[in-house]
Amino acid sequence: MAPTLLTEEQRKELIPKDWEMVVGRDAIKKTFTFKDFNQAFSFMTRVALVAEQMNHHPEWFNVYNRVEITLATHDCSGLSVNDTKMADIMNQFFNQLHQ
């Protein structure tokens, strides 16, 4: 079953508060900053493994200790529950690295 766009109520409930809407696009974004490149790459590796399992891949950009991520679902041309799940997983991985 193809993913569907989030309703306004779902958006308010499911989009993590620390993620921002992308201007001019139905997508969310966040920049994660790490101690160093190794920590950033470790985060990206963990996310990549989950993304492959979910068949839901982020758009991302990495320079040294910073990873900029944008999430949207191409199959429905906007935000779906897959994006909010992925955002929650990324936040969890980030928090685990900073305990």
From Swiss-Prot:
Family the entry assigns: Belongs to the pterin-4-alpha-carbinolamine dehydratase family.
One function term, GO molecular function aspect: 4-alpha-hydroxytetrahydrobiopterin dehydratase activity
Catalyzed reaction equations: (4aS,6R)-4a-hydroxy-L-erythro-5,6,7,8-tetrahydrobiopterin = (6R)-L-erythro-6,7-dihydrobiopterin + H2O
Keyword Lyase part of the UniProt annotation: yes
Gene3D superfamilies in alphabetical order: Transcriptional coactivator/pterin dehydratase
Known EC number: 4.2.1.96
Chloroplast keyword on record: no
Keywords for the protein's UniProt record, in alphabetical order: Lyase, Tetrahydrobiopterin biosynthesis
NCBIfam families in the record: PRK00823.1-3
InterPro entries for the chain: PCD_sf, Pterin_deHydtase
Protein name (Swiss-Prot/TrEMBL): Pterin-4-alpha-carbinolamine dehydratase
Matches recorded under Pfam families: Pterin_4a
Source organism of the structure: Dictyostelium discoideum (Social amoeba)
UniProt function note: Involved in tetrahydrobiopterin biosynthesis.
Gene (UniProt): pcbd
GO BP, sorted A to Z: tetrahydrobiopterin biosynthetic process
